[in-house]
Amino acid sequence: MKKIFLIFPNQLFKIKDQFSATKNIALIEDSLFFGCDLQWKQKFHCQKIIFHKATMNYYEQVLKQHGYNVIYIKHKRETRTEENLNYLKEKGFNHFITYEAHDWSLEKRIKNFSLKNNIILETKRSEMFITSDDLSDEIINQKKAYGMQKFYRNQRKSLNILIEKDGSPTGGEWSFDKLNRKKLPNSIKVPRLPTLGTSKFLDKAKKDVSINYQDYYGRYESFNYPLTHKEAEKWLDVFLIERFNLFGDYEDAIHSDHRTLWHSIFS
């Protein structure tokens, strides 16, 4: 049995023990994330492509430093996920390990390909969300109608977040949405986002996009997002120290001179 762990652009989690079953890792620039998919033909903003390419190149380096064998499959236009999976099949892999996809098309394609080609498919819990797919389905299927307010209330209870001993919400209310709609005062000073320097991953991604994605939307000169785990942790620290205290107050505020206000720019 030849196993390989499939990793897509939104699954670059910190390396712990999740790859204990195999040393073989496939990093896949799938067209569902990079655009011009054979079925879903939309193009994306060029900064999205830069972000995915830079972070995946960084992750490839980290994996190799940890001793993993990495197969990096680059994005090709007018393709589907199945072509990438077939490439791995032709290399002799017959046991795919994946995270929960959190993408309907991607999940369906992987499952159907595995079934048709006698591939063993093993799915692991994703770190992307606090609640697993199975638990989310179980909660939602209990009611005919299920809105986000009910879901968040259930999350508070099941995770025991800001819940009193008698089961009531801390502060006496389940939602403080009405307090999130303050207007931005003219005199208030809006904190700046951290400024990230250049890196070989960013430079390589920008060059790739400038050559191969000229027809995609937007401009990339203003790109300023964390690309490594260390940068993301620093970005989180800055958010908690400088922005979190007023995030709730101005969560719904907008201003023509400021793009981010007190938001974290994490999701």
Regions found by a protein language model. Name each.
Residues 60, 64-71, 90-95, 212-219, ...:
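Glycine-rich, often proline-containing surface loops adjacent to acidic residues and nearby aromatics
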Residues 9-11, 74-77, 100-102, 240:
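Short, flexible loop/turn elements at secondary-structure junctions
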Residues 2-11, 16-18, 171-267:
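Substrate/cofactor-recognition hotspot
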Residues 55-58, 80-84:
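Well-ordered alpha-helical segments embedded in enzymatic catalytic cores
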Residues 13, 33, 78, 104, ...:
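Surface-exposed, flexible loop/turn segments at secondary-structure boundaries
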Residues 44-51, 73, 98, 102, ...:
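Conserved aromatic-histidine-acidic binding/catalytic patches
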Residues 1-75:
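N-terminal beta-strand-loop-alpha-helix module at the start
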Residues 81-225:
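Beta-rich, aromatic/charged-enriched effector core domains that present basic-aromatic interfaces
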